[in-house]
């Protein structure tokens, strides 16, 4: 029999194409009654339609396909949740089914075993670490009024810095980050650092933002979707290693110092000392130095960048909305006066100020999209989802839903106030997520936001530098939604 090479080649090609298309169809619809979503090309999925501010793009998908829809990132299938109903059903009503975290190439670069608090899978190890960390931090006053003085101490340092740098354009981001980081330092190492004097501290703290930016970059996501690209991502991989490595070395040095000076007879004075004691008492191998290091890494990453970026946004919104700034200052003057700094107990008497902070958190939606994964095969709003399904909850879509918040792009604190000026309760608000993986630092973050924000505004006003256009209110999305670099003129109120 004579075999025609041309026919064989065509047959092989046709077979390969059919296989690729079949695999694509299988990946596109892994189970029956799977959530709908845009069709795309085999191999590329719907990537050609992708837009970099994904939170807005995902909202558009929600408008077209509903609150539960699917999306193909190359060959990777993701379910996207938009709107309060689907996100609440997943994170709260069916909390256990949606409590896992997905695996990601960027995470393997700094946390290959998925340890710690944020990236960890939903299992007993995560539960033990989260439970012990939360209980111990609460014991040291984390999120309680007894911790207020530690925060106020840092507010006072920030005020000193503002006084020394007023009446000229300045970039305040690093200084805010350092003040906020010192709060986590107090609770984990029992020590604060001088912002100007300690180069190791400065290096470690200022790299947190670089770490978030590099780890959240679209380029590294591409490495996750198309593994063959990994050898070409040396620059981005190096940036993650460098930034995370600096923070890691700083934290390991703190742990080593504590190990050297550990005195078994003394009561632990901070989180590291408590954890080291727990390792000694633990007979089942549940606690180790490796877990300790990752837990502290997570506390610094999740607890520093988030609060400091929110406060940086707060300054940006105040300088661009002088009417709101004035209203807040007027309320603080009436309730507290300018002679002393506001305390957390004042917040009940400052509804406009509270409403401004809520509106800020709504409009920036600091962590716009939170990654979750299913722990088992489950259903959501009538659709079937397989186990280990990557699910992204678009919190931004709640906070920018025009039905819940008319004219969502408008910054208007009054939407959080009743007609009589009292604070309005709002069930459709979740900047800290919800359910089993809800932010562990929510109570601390709320206290920090109130004390820093009111401390800054009771003493200073913020303005756009003369002769320059208003800074952009559009941010850049990495893990968090960050403002673009900007300068502000700080003026002491007299
Ligand atoms: C304005 C400040 C903050 C915001 C907006 C914020 C927001 C969030 C969000 C949206 C999540 C994910 C929730 C989910 O997956 O459903 C999260 C998780 C987390 N946050 Fe925060 N956070 C803030 C401050 C803090 C602080 C101060 C700490 C600790 C000191 C902290 C520690 C954590 C931890 C450990 C997790 C992981 C929880 C887990 O997966 O079990 N956060 N945060």
PLM regions and their residue ranges:
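Cytochrome P450 heme-binding "Cys pocket" and the immediately downstream C-terminal segment
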Residues: 99, 322-324, 442-480
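Cytochrome P450 heme-thiolate "Cys pocket" and heme-binding signature region
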Residues: 297, 302, 419-449, 474-476
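C-terminal helix/juxtamembrane-tail motif
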Residues: 1-6, 13-16, 274-277, 390, ...
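Classical protein tyrosine phosphatase
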Residues: 34, 80-90, 96-99, 191-201, ...
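Conserved cytochrome P450 K-helix E-x-x-R motif and the immediately C-terminal K′/meander segment
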Residues: 47-66, 249, 342-381, 402, ...
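Cytochrome P450 heme-thiolate monooxygenase catalytic core
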Residues: 101-110, 144-311, 327
């Amino acid at each position: 029999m004579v075999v025609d090479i041309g026919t064989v080649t065509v047959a092989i090609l046709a077979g390969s194409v059919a296989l690729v298309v079949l695999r694509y169809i299988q990946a596109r619809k892994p189970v029956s009654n799977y959530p709908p979503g845009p069709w795309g090309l085999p191999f590329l999925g719907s990537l050609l339609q992708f837009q970099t501010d994904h939170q807005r793009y995902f909202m558009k998908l929600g408008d077209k396909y509903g609150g539960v829809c699917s999306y193909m990132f190359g060959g990777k299938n993701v379910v996207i949740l938009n709107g309060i109903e689907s996100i609440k059903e997943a994170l709260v009503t069916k909390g256990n089914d949606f409590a896992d975290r997905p695996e990601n190439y960027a995470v393997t670069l700094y946390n290959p075993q998925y340890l710690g608090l944020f990236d960890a899978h939903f299992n007993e190890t995560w539960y033990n670490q989260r439970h012990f960390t939360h209980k111990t931090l609460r014991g040291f006053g984390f999120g309680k009024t007894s911790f207020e003085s530690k925060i106020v101490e840092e507010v006072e340092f920030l005020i000193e810095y503002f006084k020394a740098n007023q009446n000229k354009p300045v970039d305040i981001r690093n200084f805010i980050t350092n003040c906020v980081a010192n709060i986590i330092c107090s609770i984990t190492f029992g020590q604060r650092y001088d912002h100007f004097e300690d180069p190791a501290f400065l290096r470690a703290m200022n790299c947190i933002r670089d770490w978030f930016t590099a780890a959240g970059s679209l380029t590294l996501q591409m490495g996750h979707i198309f593994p063959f690209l990994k050898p070409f991502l040396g620059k981005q991989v190096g940036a993650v290693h460098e930034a995370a490595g600096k923070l890691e070395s700083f934290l390991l040095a703190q742990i080593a110092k504590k190990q050297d000076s550990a005195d078994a007879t003394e009561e632990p004075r901070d989180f590291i000392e408590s954890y080291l004691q727990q390792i000694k008492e633990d007979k089942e191998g549940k606690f180790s130095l490796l877990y300790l290091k990752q837990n502290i890494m997570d506390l610094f990453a999740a607890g520093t960048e988030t609060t400091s970026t929110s406060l940086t946004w707060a300054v940006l919104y105040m300088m661009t909305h002088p009417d709101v700034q004035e209203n807040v200052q007027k309320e603080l003057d009436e309730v507290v006066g300018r002679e002393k700094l506001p305390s957390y107990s004042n917040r009940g008497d400052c509804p406009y100020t509270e409403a401004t902070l809520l509106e800020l958190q709504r409009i920036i939606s600091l962590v716009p999209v939170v990654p979750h994964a299913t722990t088992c095969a489950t259903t959501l709003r009538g659709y079937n989802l397989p186990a280990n399904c990557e699910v992204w909850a678009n919190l931004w879509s709640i906070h920018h839903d025009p039905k819940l918040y008319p004219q969502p792009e408008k910054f208007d604190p009054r939407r959080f106030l009743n007609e009589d000026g009292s604070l309005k309760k709002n069930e459709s608000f979740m900047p800290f997520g919800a359910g089993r993986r809800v932010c562990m630092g929510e109570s601390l973050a709320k206290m920090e936001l109130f004390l820093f924000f009111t401390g800054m505004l009771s003493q200073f006003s913020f303005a756009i530098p003369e002769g320059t256009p208003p800074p952009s209110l559009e941010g850049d999305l990495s893990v968090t939604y960050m403002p673009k670099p900007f300068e502000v003129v700080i003026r002491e109120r007299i």
